[in-house]
């Protein structure tokens, strides 16, 4: 699963996801892509599950690019522990996704295979997404 090799700080504030994606909103590598439609936190397990679903349907033909990286540590206190006594330990890593953010890109396959592969991948994610295609000039 994806996670940073090293970080400056172990824990982070929760924060809020406001606005739309400034960068990373266009197709940069592939011919087809999966674009986020709503803001949410996507964890590393979801990204990995989506990647597996996409590559499995494509039968390892073509190429997949993951355009998001889980760099936010999400903490959790153990069950049945009273409030206070500090912040909990890091439970998993997540990525804050804004609307308009390109999450996955694929290339080297036909449109119908790409559409179905990304549909299967989007089912694993906790954000509403849509299929996008590069406009031929």
Swiss-Prot record:
**InterPro entries from the entry?**
Ribosomal_uL16, Ribosomal_uL16_bact-type, Ribosomal_uL16_CS, Ribosomal_uL16_dom, Ribosomal_uL16_sf
Q: Which UniProt keywords apply?
A: Ribonucleoprotein, Ribosomal protein, RNA-binding, rRNA-binding, tRNA-binding
Q: Which Pfam families match?
A: Ribosomal_L16
What PROSITE patterns is this protein classified in? RIBOSOMAL_L16_1 (PS00586), RIBOSOMAL_L16_2 (PS00701)
Q: Give me any GO biological process, just one.
A: translation
CDD domains documented for this protein: Ribosomal_L16_L10e
Provide a Gene Ontology MF annotation, just one. Answer: tRNA binding
Any one cellular-component term (Gene Ontology)? cytosolic large ribosomal subunit
**Organism superkingdom:** Bacteria
Q: Which NCBIfam families match?
A: rplP_bact
The family classification in the record reads: Belongs to the universal ribosomal protein uL16 family.
Oligomer status and interactors: Part of the 50S ribosomal subunit.
This chain's function reads: Binds 23S rRNA and is also seen to make contacts with the A and possibly P site tRNAs.
Q: In its UniProt entry, what is this protein called?
A: Large ribosomal subunit protein uL16
* Gene label: rplP
């Amino acid at each position: 699963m994806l996670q940073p090799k090293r970080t400056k700080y172990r824990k982070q504030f929760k924060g809020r996801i406001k606005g739309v994606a400034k960068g990373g909103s266009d197709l940069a590598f592939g011919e087809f892509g999966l674009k986020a439609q709503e803001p949410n936190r996507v964890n590393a397990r979801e990204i990995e599950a989506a990647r597996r679903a996409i590559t499995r349907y494509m039968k390892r033909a073509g190429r997949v690019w993951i355009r998001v990286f889980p760099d936010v540590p999400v903490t959790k206190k153990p069950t049945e522990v009273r409030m206070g006594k500090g912040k909990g330990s890091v439970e998993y890593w997540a990525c804050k996704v804004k609307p308009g953010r390109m999450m996955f890109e694929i290339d080297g396959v036909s449109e119908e295979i790409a559409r179905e592969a990304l549909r299967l991948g989007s089912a694993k994610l906790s954000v509403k997404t849509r299929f996008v295609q590069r406009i031929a000039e």
